Amino acid sequence: MAVMAPRTLVLLLSGALALTQTWAGSHSMRYFYTSVSRPGRGEPRFIAVGYVDDTQFVRFDSDAASQRMEPRAPWIEQEEPEYWDGETRNMKARSQTDRVDLGTLRGYYNQSEDGSHTIQRMYGCDVGSDGRFLRGYQQDAYDGKDYIALNEDLRSWTAADMAAQITQRKWEAAHEAEQLRAYLEGTCVEWLRRYLENGKETLQLTDAPKTHMTHHPVSDHEAILRCWALSFYPAEITLTWQRDGEDQTQDTELVETRPAGDGTFQKWAAVVVPSGQEQRYTCHVQHEGLPKPLTLRWEPSSQPTIPIVGIIAGLVLFGAVIAGAVVAAVRWRRKSSDRKGGSYSQAASSDSAQGSDVSLTACKV
Protein backbone atom coordinates (compact mmCIF):
# COMPACT_ATOMS: atom_id res chain seq x y z
CA MET A 1 0.00 0.00 0.00
CA ALA A 2 1.15 3.42 -0.58
CA VAL A 3 3.42 4.63 2.05
CA MET A 4 1.88 7.48 3.89
CA ALA A 5 4.48 10.06 3.87
CA PRO A 6 4.77 12.24 6.88
CA ARG A 7 5.17 15.65 5.47
CA THR A 8 8.69 16.56 4.98
CA LEU A 9 8.63 19.93 6.51
CA VAL A 10 12.13 20.65 7.34
CA LEU A 11 12.68 22.78 10.31
CA LEU A 12 16.10 24.29 10.68
CA LEU A 13 16.83 24.61 14.31
CA SER A 14 20.05 26.19 15.25
CA GLY A 15 22.45 23.27 14.98
CA ALA A 16 24.52 24.41 17.89
CA LEU A 17 21.48 24.72 20.12
CA ALA A 18 20.12 21.37 19.04
CA LEU A 19 23.29 19.45 19.79
CA THR A 20 24.09 21.15 23.08
CA GLN A 21 20.57 20.64 24.44
CA THR A 22 20.29 17.69 26.82
CA TRP A 23 17.11 15.81 27.72
CA ALA A 24 16.54 13.01 30.17
CA GLY A 25 16.38 9.67 28.39
CA SER A 26 15.42 9.01 24.79
CA HIS A 27 12.45 10.63 23.03
CA SER A 28 10.34 9.79 20.01
CA MET A 29 8.08 11.44 17.45
CA ARG A 30 5.57 9.19 15.71
CA TYR A 31 2.73 9.65 13.28
CA PHE A 32 -0.14 7.21 12.85
CA TYR A 33 -2.29 7.28 9.71
CA THR A 34 -5.47 5.29 9.13
CA SER A 35 -7.80 5.17 6.14
CA VAL A 36 -11.02 3.17 6.20
CA SER A 37 -13.13 2.62 3.09
CA ARG A 38 -16.91 2.66 3.42
CA PRO A 39 -18.59 1.52 0.22
CA GLY A 40 -21.81 3.34 -0.55
CA ARG A 41 -21.13 6.01 2.06
CA GLY A 42 -18.74 8.31 0.29
CA GLU A 43 -14.99 8.86 0.54
CA PRO A 44 -12.85 6.77 2.89
CA ARG A 45 -12.35 8.24 6.34
CA PHE A 46 -8.79 9.35 7.00
CA ILE A 47 -7.40 10.04 10.46
CA ALA A 48 -3.87 11.12 11.35
CA VAL A 49 -2.41 11.70 14.79
CA GLY A 50 1.07 12.75 15.87
CA TYR A 51 2.78 11.92 19.15
CA VAL A 52 5.88 13.18 20.91
CA ASP A 53 6.70 10.42 23.37
CA ASP A 54 3.30 9.54 24.85
CA THR A 55 1.70 12.94 24.24
CA GLN A 56 -0.61 13.50 21.28
CA PHE A 57 0.08 16.92 19.78
CA VAL A 58 -1.78 17.02 16.43
CA ARG A 59 -4.81 15.35 14.86
CA PHE A 60 -6.57 15.39 11.51
CA ASP A 61 -9.94 13.77 10.79
CA SER A 62 -11.43 13.93 7.31
CA ASP A 63 -14.90 13.69 8.88
CA ALA A 64 -14.37 16.67 11.18
CA ALA A 65 -16.20 19.90 10.45
CA SER A 66 -12.96 21.90 10.29
CA GLN A 67 -11.19 19.61 7.80
CA ARG A 68 -7.90 20.89 9.25
CA MET A 69 -4.93 19.62 11.18
CA GLU A 70 -5.68 20.61 14.76
CA PRO A 71 -3.47 21.10 17.84
CA ARG A 72 -3.77 18.66 20.72
CA ALA A 73 -1.10 20.10 23.04
CA PRO A 74 -0.65 23.69 24.28
CA TRP A 75 2.96 23.97 23.14
CA ILE A 76 2.13 23.27 19.47
CA GLU A 77 -0.40 26.10 19.34
CA GLN A 78 2.41 28.64 19.02
CA GLU A 79 3.18 27.48 15.48
CA GLU A 80 2.39 30.04 12.77
CA PRO A 81 -0.75 29.86 10.60
CA GLU A 82 1.44 28.79 7.67
CA TYR A 83 2.39 25.68 9.59
CA TRP A 84 -1.25 24.64 10.02
CA ASP A 85 -2.09 25.48 6.41
CA GLY A 86 0.77 23.30 5.20
CA GLU A 87 -0.09 20.43 7.51
CA THR A 88 -3.71 20.55 6.39
CA ARG A 89 -2.77 20.49 2.70
CA ASN A 90 -0.51 17.53 3.28
CA MET A 91 -3.17 15.58 5.13
CA LYS A 92 -5.77 16.21 2.46
CA ALA A 93 -3.33 15.09 -0.22
CA ARG A 94 -2.47 12.02 1.85
CA SER A 95 -6.11 11.10 2.20
CA GLN A 96 -6.51 11.14 -1.58
CA THR A 97 -3.45 8.96 -2.05
CA ASP A 98 -4.90 6.51 0.43
CA ARG A 99 -8.18 6.48 -1.43
CA VAL A 100 -6.35 5.33 -4.56
CA ASP A 101 -4.27 2.84 -2.58
CA LEU A 102 -7.36 1.22 -1.09
CA GLY A 103 -8.58 0.48 -4.59
CA THR A 104 -5.17 -0.78 -5.68
CA LEU A 105 -4.86 -3.12 -2.72
CA ARG A 106 -8.35 -4.44 -3.25
CA GLY A 107 -7.20 -5.42 -6.72
CA TYR A 108 -3.99 -7.03 -5.45
CA TYR A 109 -6.02 -9.25 -3.12
CA ASN A 110 -8.85 -9.84 -5.61
CA GLN A 111 -11.45 -8.42 -3.23
CA SER A 112 -14.91 -7.15 -4.13
CA GLU A 113 -15.95 -3.53 -3.84
CA ASP A 114 -18.58 -4.34 -1.22
CA GLY A 115 -16.48 -4.69 1.91
CA SER A 116 -14.75 -2.09 4.05
CA HIS A 117 -10.95 -2.14 4.15
CA THR A 118 -8.28 -0.38 6.18
CA ILE A 119 -4.81 0.95 5.50
CA GLN A 120 -2.58 1.88 8.44
CA ARG A 121 0.86 3.39 8.80
CA MET A 122 3.16 4.24 11.67
CA TYR A 123 6.45 6.05 11.16
CA GLY A 124 8.82 8.23 13.13
CA CYS A 125 12.19 8.62 14.78
CA ASP A 126 13.89 8.39 18.17
CA VAL A 127 16.64 10.60 19.58
CA GLY A 128 18.92 10.07 22.55
CA SER A 129 19.40 12.31 25.57
CA ASP A 130 21.89 14.33 23.51
CA GLY A 131 19.31 14.97 20.77
CA ARG A 132 21.09 12.78 18.23
CA PHE A 133 19.36 10.28 15.95
CA LEU A 134 18.94 6.78 17.38
CA ARG A 135 16.57 4.99 15.00
CA GLY A 136 13.84 5.45 12.45
CA TYR A 137 10.95 3.25 11.37
CA GLN A 138 7.94 2.90 9.12
CA GLN A 139 5.40 0.08 9.16
CA ASP A 140 2.34 -0.37 6.96
CA ALA A 141 -0.62 -2.68 7.42
CA TYR A 142 -3.68 -3.66 5.39
CA ASP A 143 -6.85 -4.92 7.05
CA GLY A 144 -5.05 -5.27 10.36
CA LYS A 145 -2.18 -7.42 9.04
CA ASP A 146 1.44 -6.54 8.35
CA TYR A 147 1.96 -5.44 4.77
CA ILE A 148 5.39 -3.87 4.35
CA ALA A 149 7.98 -2.39 6.70
CA LEU A 150 11.20 -0.44 6.45
CA ASN A 151 14.09 -2.48 7.81
CA GLU A 152 16.38 -1.25 10.58
CA ASP A 153 19.09 -0.36 8.06
CA LEU A 154 16.67 2.22 6.58
CA ARG A 155 17.72 1.01 3.13
CA SER A 156 15.54 -2.01 2.43
CA TRP A 157 12.04 -3.36 2.91
CA THR A 158 10.39 -6.49 4.28
CA ALA A 159 7.23 -7.47 2.40
CA ALA A 160 4.71 -9.69 4.19
CA ASP A 161 3.26 -11.45 1.13
CA MET A 162 3.16 -11.57 -2.66
CA ALA A 163 0.99 -8.46 -2.93
CA ALA A 164 3.37 -6.48 -0.76
CA GLN A 165 6.24 -7.59 -2.99
CA ILE A 166 4.60 -5.67 -5.83
CA THR A 167 4.70 -2.56 -3.68
CA GLN A 168 8.27 -3.33 -2.65
CA ARG A 169 9.42 -3.46 -6.27
CA LYS A 170 7.69 -0.15 -7.01
CA TRP A 171 9.28 1.54 -4.03
CA GLU A 172 12.71 0.12 -4.80
CA ALA A 173 12.48 1.47 -8.34
CA ALA A 174 11.45 4.88 -6.97
CA HIS A 175 14.26 4.87 -4.33
CA GLU A 176 11.63 5.32 -1.66
CA ALA A 177 13.82 4.07 1.20
CA GLU A 178 16.56 6.57 0.37
CA GLN A 179 14.14 9.48 0.52
CA LEU A 180 12.45 8.19 3.66
CA ARG A 181 15.83 7.73 5.35
CA ALA A 182 16.69 11.37 4.61
CA TYR A 183 13.47 12.44 6.32
CA LEU A 184 13.91 10.17 9.35
CA GLU A 185 17.54 11.11 9.98
CA GLY A 186 17.08 14.79 9.19
CA THR A 187 13.70 16.49 9.19
CA CYS A 188 12.13 14.17 11.76
CA VAL A 189 14.98 14.67 14.21
CA GLU A 190 15.04 18.44 13.75
CA TRP A 191 11.33 18.80 14.42
CA LEU A 192 11.47 16.47 17.39
CA ARG A 193 14.20 18.62 18.93
CA ARG A 194 12.10 21.70 18.33
CA TYR A 195 9.02 20.17 19.90
CA LEU A 196 10.99 18.97 22.93
CA GLU A 197 12.30 22.49 23.44
CA ASN A 198 8.94 24.20 22.94
CA GLY A 199 7.12 21.70 25.13
CA LYS A 200 9.84 21.13 27.70
CA GLU A 201 7.64 22.23 30.61
CA THR A 202 5.45 19.16 30.06
CA LEU A 203 7.30 16.78 27.72
CA GLN A 204 10.41 16.61 29.88
CA LEU A 205 8.64 16.16 33.18
CA THR A 206 8.40 12.74 34.80
CA ASP A 207 5.85 11.39 37.26
CA ALA A 208 7.18 8.62 39.47
CA PRO A 209 4.89 5.60 39.83
CA LYS A 210 2.75 5.19 42.92
CA THR A 211 3.26 1.59 43.96
CA HIS A 212 1.58 -0.92 46.22
CA MET A 213 1.00 -4.66 46.48
CA THR A 214 -2.18 -6.67 46.93
CA HIS A 215 -2.69 -10.22 48.18
CA HIS A 216 -5.43 -12.47 46.76
CA PRO A 217 -5.95 -15.96 48.27
CA VAL A 218 -6.73 -18.53 45.58
CA SER A 219 -7.03 -21.58 47.83
CA ASP A 220 -5.77 -22.86 51.16
CA HIS A 221 -2.44 -23.51 49.50
CA GLU A 222 -1.87 -20.62 47.07
CA ALA A 223 -2.26 -16.88 46.75
CA ILE A 224 -1.69 -14.25 44.08
CA LEU A 225 0.62 -11.33 44.78
CA ARG A 226 -0.03 -8.40 42.48
CA CYS A 227 2.43 -5.52 42.19
CA TRP A 228 0.85 -2.23 41.07
CA ALA A 229 2.39 0.88 39.50
CA LEU A 230 0.00 3.79 39.00
CA SER A 231 0.02 7.43 37.82
CA PHE A 232 3.44 7.36 36.13
CA TYR A 233 4.81 9.21 33.09
CA PRO A 234 6.35 8.49 30.63
CA ALA A 235 4.87 5.11 29.82
CA GLU A 236 8.06 3.05 29.81
CA ILE A 237 8.39 1.05 33.02
CA THR A 238 9.74 -2.32 34.16
CA LEU A 239 8.09 -4.53 36.79
CA THR A 240 10.02 -7.66 37.77
CA TRP A 241 9.17 -10.37 40.30
CA GLN A 242 11.95 -12.23 42.11
CA ARG A 243 11.94 -15.22 44.44
CA ASP A 244 14.93 -15.33 46.79
CA GLY A 245 16.67 -12.90 44.44
CA GLU A 246 16.03 -14.89 41.24
CA ASP A 247 13.86 -13.51 38.43
CA GLN A 248 10.48 -15.21 37.99
CA THR A 249 9.95 -14.09 34.40
CA GLN A 250 8.30 -17.31 33.23
CA ASP A 251 5.87 -17.36 36.14
CA THR A 252 4.87 -13.69 35.99
CA GLU A 253 1.54 -12.52 34.59
CA LEU A 254 2.14 -9.07 33.15
CA VAL A 255 -0.36 -6.68 31.57
CA GLU A 256 0.56 -4.12 28.96
CA THR A 257 1.02 -0.56 30.14
CA ARG A 258 -2.34 1.21 29.99
CA PRO A 259 -3.33 4.89 29.85
CA ALA A 260 -5.00 6.06 33.05
CA GLY A 261 -7.08 8.69 31.28
CA ASP A 262 -5.37 11.68 32.90
CA GLY A 263 -2.15 11.67 30.87
CA THR A 264 -0.41 9.14 33.11
CA PHE A 265 -0.13 5.34 32.87
CA GLN A 266 -0.65 2.22 34.96
CA LYS A 267 0.57 -1.37 34.98
CA TRP A 268 0.64 -4.46 37.18
CA ALA A 269 2.51 -7.75 37.41
CA ALA A 270 1.40 -10.82 39.38
CA VAL A 271 2.73 -14.17 40.56
CA VAL A 272 1.10 -17.20 42.19
CA VAL A 273 2.90 -18.09 45.41
CA PRO A 274 2.57 -20.91 47.99
CA SER A 275 0.67 -19.72 51.05
CA GLY A 276 3.05 -18.80 53.84
CA GLN A 277 5.97 -18.10 51.48
CA GLU A 278 4.99 -14.58 50.44
CA GLN A 279 8.04 -13.04 52.14
CA ARG A 280 10.35 -14.83 49.71
CA TYR A 281 8.97 -12.77 46.81
CA THR A 282 9.89 -9.19 45.91
CA CYS A 283 8.67 -6.86 43.17
CA HIS A 284 11.23 -4.54 41.55
CA VAL A 285 10.10 -1.34 39.83
CA GLN A 286 12.26 0.69 37.44
CA HIS A 287 11.10 4.01 35.98
CA GLU A 288 12.67 7.23 34.75
CA GLY A 289 10.89 9.20 37.48
CA LEU A 290 12.46 7.17 40.30
CA PRO A 291 15.87 8.19 41.70
CA LYS A 292 16.60 4.47 42.09
CA PRO A 293 14.66 1.22 41.52
CA LEU A 294 12.06 0.33 44.13
CA THR A 295 11.77 -3.03 45.88
CA LEU A 296 8.38 -4.04 47.29
CA ARG A 297 7.63 -6.94 49.60
CA TRP A 298 4.26 -8.13 50.89
CA GLU A 299 3.56 -6.72 54.35
CA PRO A 300 0.38 -8.41 55.64
CA SER A 301 -0.10 -5.95 58.48
CA SER A 302 -0.31 -2.88 56.24
CA GLN A 303 -1.66 -4.07 52.89
CA PRO A 304 -5.06 -5.50 51.95
CA THR A 305 -5.89 -9.12 51.37
CA ILE A 306 -8.65 -9.44 48.76
CA PRO A 307 -10.52 -12.76 48.37
CA ILE A 308 -10.23 -14.09 44.82
CA VAL A 309 -14.05 -14.53 44.67
CA GLY A 310 -14.47 -10.82 45.21
CA ILE A 311 -11.89 -10.12 42.55
CA ILE A 312 -13.62 -12.32 40.01
CA ALA A 313 -16.92 -10.55 40.63
CA GLY A 314 -15.23 -7.20 40.31
CA LEU A 315 -13.36 -8.21 37.20
CA VAL A 316 -16.56 -9.29 35.48
CA LEU A 317 -17.83 -5.74 35.74
CA PHE A 318 -14.40 -4.24 35.12
CA GLY A 319 -13.91 -6.54 32.16
CA ALA A 320 -17.11 -5.33 30.57
CA VAL A 321 -15.93 -1.75 30.92
CA ILE A 322 -12.47 -2.59 29.60
CA ALA A 323 -13.92 -4.58 26.70
CA GLY A 324 -15.83 -1.53 25.59
CA ALA A 325 -12.75 0.62 26.00
CA VAL A 326 -10.61 -1.84 24.05
CA VAL A 327 -13.08 -1.93 21.18
CA ALA A 328 -13.11 1.85 21.10
CA ALA A 329 -9.32 1.95 21.32
CA VAL A 330 -8.92 -0.54 18.50
CA ARG A 331 -11.29 1.42 16.34
CA TRP A 332 -9.45 4.62 17.13
CA ARG A 333 -6.10 2.95 16.66
CA ARG A 334 -7.05 1.70 13.25
CA LYS A 335 -8.20 5.14 12.29
CA SER A 336 -5.23 6.94 13.77
CA SER A 337 -2.43 4.60 12.80
CA ASP A 338 -3.05 4.29 9.08
CA ARG A 339 -0.38 5.48 6.69
CA LYS A 340 -0.80 5.38 2.96
CA GLY A 341 2.03 5.04 0.64
CA GLY A 342 4.04 8.12 0.16
CA SER A 343 7.05 8.69 -2.00
CA TYR A 344 9.63 10.67 -0.21
CA SER A 345 10.74 12.41 -3.37
CA GLN A 346 10.04 16.04 -2.60
CA ALA A 347 13.10 18.08 -1.78
CA ALA A 348 13.31 19.08 1.85
CA SER A 349 12.37 22.64 2.64
CA SER A 350 13.42 24.88 5.50
CA ASP A 351 10.02 26.55 5.54
CA SER A 352 8.47 25.93 8.94
CA ALA A 353 5.06 26.09 7.30
CA GLN A 354 5.61 22.58 6.03
CA GLY A 355 5.43 20.81 9.33
CA SER A 356 7.09 17.76 10.83
CA ASP A 357 5.39 14.92 9.00
CA VAL A 358 6.39 13.54 5.63
CA SER A 359 4.92 15.53 2.77
CA LEU A 360 6.55 14.02 -0.25
CA THR A 361 5.18 13.13 -3.62
CA ALA A 362 3.01 10.08 -3.12
CA CYS A 363 4.51 6.79 -4.26
CA LYS A 364 1.54 4.49 -4.53
CA VAL A 365 1.38 0.84 -3.56
Swiss-Prot record:
Residues 1-24 form the signal peptide. It is found in: Membrane. The chain crosses the membrane at residues 309-332. Keywords: Disulfide bond, Glycoprotein, Immunity, Membrane, MHC I, Phosphoprotein, Signal, Transmembrane, Transmembrane helix. The modification Phosphotyrosine is found at Y344. Residues 25-114 are annotated as: Alpha-1. Residues 342-359 have a biased composition (Low complexity). It is a single-pass type I membrane protein. It comes from the Eukaryota. GO terms for molecular function: peptide antigen binding; signaling receptor binding. Residues 338-365 are annotated as: Disordered. Residues 115-206 are annotated as: Alpha-2. One of its GO terms (cellular component) is recycling endosome membrane. Heterodimer of an alpha chain and a beta chain (beta-2-microglobulin). Belongs to the MHC class I family. This is Class I histocompatibility antigen, Gogo-A*0401 alpha chain. It comes from Gorilla gorilla gorilla.
